[in-house]
């Protein structure tokens, strides 16, 4: 645990040395918060983790979209090492055939997901902007309740909807979450990369 804390401190010092004073303060504060969460064994907010991983990826317009997807896959897997114990970490790939399906998916795809009916109804409600907090209480598993919290934040994302990606990002996140958080980040992030 000390080793992770020392790595986090070293990385924050390295990253903040090249930034302006305001950026350095924000980055340092954010890294200290993540290090504190890791040191205490508290799981960081998955929505913030998703945003952090996505925002730290630099799309290279000199390369093809396919090459950028591979770089994104590698980036996500490297970043996940900061959020999961190394003993449980395993490299996860984007299945390109599944990504093509998700790029074409609409709300009918939600029925194919392996969640309880209450969770599927909540996903429909989030996408339709009809979600309310009472719906979460109907969901019996903690992992699916956590998914709803993340999806609500992801769908709202400060702008009230996910229309930029025609709800495909939210559907991709829900699909990936069936398997792991890493898969959710990979597929939802890959959908976001389409806009670049």
Where are these regions (language model features)?
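Sequence-pattern detector for short linear motifs
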Residues: 5-6, 123, 172
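N-terminal propeptides/leader regions of secreted preproproteins
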Residues: 18-163
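Enrichment for repetitive, rod-forming helical segments
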Residues: 9-10, 152, 190
